[in-house]
Amino acid sequence: MRVISRKILRDFGESHADSCDALYDWYRVSSKAEWQNLIDVQQIYPKAESVGNFTVFNIKGNRYRLIVDLVYVSQRIYIKYVLTHAEYDKDEWKNDPYF
C-alpha cells in the first residue's frame, strides 16, 4: 500500500522519540502490504480496529494511537493523526469531518 503523509509520522517522532522505531516498523510493514479489508490488516495487527471511517492502530504497546484512512481499492493509506493514548481518549480527533 502507498502511505500518504509520512511527514506526520516523522514530525510526531521528533517530539516523541520513543515512538520512532515502532512507527518506522508500522510504515515498513504497511507500505509492503496489499490489504483488501480489515481482516487482512488484523492478520498482521490483531488489535487494529475500525472507528468511524478510520482505522486505528495501537503503537508501542498501546502508548500511542495511529489513526489512518485505509482505501483498499486504490491501495492507499492516508495518515490522519498520531496521538498519545491520553489525546486519543479525549475524542477530539472524532471532530474530523471525514469521521
Residue ranges and their predicted role:
Residues 1-63, 71-76, 86-99:
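Basic, Lys/Arg-enriched alpha-helical interface segments
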Residues 79-83:
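Catalytic Cys-His active-site segments of thiol-dependent hydrolases/isopeptidases
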